[in-house]
A protein has these predicted regions:
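Catalytic phosphate/metal-binding cores of nucleic-acid and nucleotide-processing enzymes, i.e., regions
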Residues: 1-166
C-alpha cells in the first residue's frame, strides 16, 4: 500500500503509519524513490526503481514513535504514568544530530503529528504539547507540529538535507 492509501482513514494513527512507510523507503532507496514509490502501488516498483537511482538515507532507520497515547482506563493510565509516560511528549523522534559550519548545531528532530485540515477537522496541539515543543527547542532540538504525513515527510527531508531551521 502507498502512504496515501495508508493515510486514507484520516486518523492521526493512519498518518503515522503512512509516514513510517515513506521513511522505510527513503532509508533504503533515498528521498526521490520514496516520493515516487508513494505515488504508485507495489506492482510498479520495478518500473520506479529503474527510473530513480538509489541514494539511501540509512539514518532514517533511527526514526521512532513515542508511545504516549491515551491509555484507556484509570488503572492502565496509572501504570503508564508510573512507567514514565509524560503527557504532551511529541509523537515522533529522529535522533540524528546536525552539526556544521553553515548549519546550526541541533541534537535531533521531534514531530508532533496531527491530522491535516483536509481530512476531517484539523488536529490541534494541546498546551502540554506546546510546552514540550518549546522546551525541546530551548534544549537544542528542532521540535515542530506537522499536519499529516506529507508535511512530516517534507519536514524530515528538509532536516536531513539541512534546510530546516528553528
Amino acid at each position: 500500500m502507498t502512504p496515501w492509501e495508508l493515510a486514507k482513514p484520516g486518523t492521526e494513527h493512519a498518518h503515522q503509519r503512512a509516514l513510517f512507510a515513506w521513511a522505510a523507503n527513503a532509508a533504503l532507496f533515498g528521498f526521490n524513490f520514496a516520493w515516487e514509490e508513494a505515488a504508485y502501488d507495489h506492482r510498479t516498483r520495478e518500473h520506479v526503481a529503474q527510473r530513480i537511482w538509489a541514494n539511501p538515507v540509512p539514518k532514517l532507520t533511527r526514526l521512532f514513535a513515542v508511545h504516549n497515547q491515551g491509555h484507556g482506563d484509570r488503572i492502565r493510565g496509572a501504570r503508564a504514568k508510573a512507567e514514565g509516560v509524560k503527557p504532551g511528549v511529541p509523537d515522533i523522534m529522529l535522533p540524528v544530530a546536525q552539526r556544521g559550519i553553515d548549519v546550526m548545531t541541533c541534537s535531533g528532530l521531534f514531530i508532533e503529528l496531527k491530522r491535516p485540515k483536509a481530512v476531517k477537522r484539523q488536529g490541534i496541539a494541546s498546551d502540554k504539547q506546546f510546552e514540550w515543543l518549546a522546551y525541546l527547542n530551548d534544549e537544542g532540538y528542532i521540535a515542530v507540529v506537522c499536519y499529516g504525513w506529507e508535511h512530516a515527510a517534507k519536514t524530515i527531508q528538509n532536516y536531513m538535507e539541512r534546510k530546516l531551521t528553528r
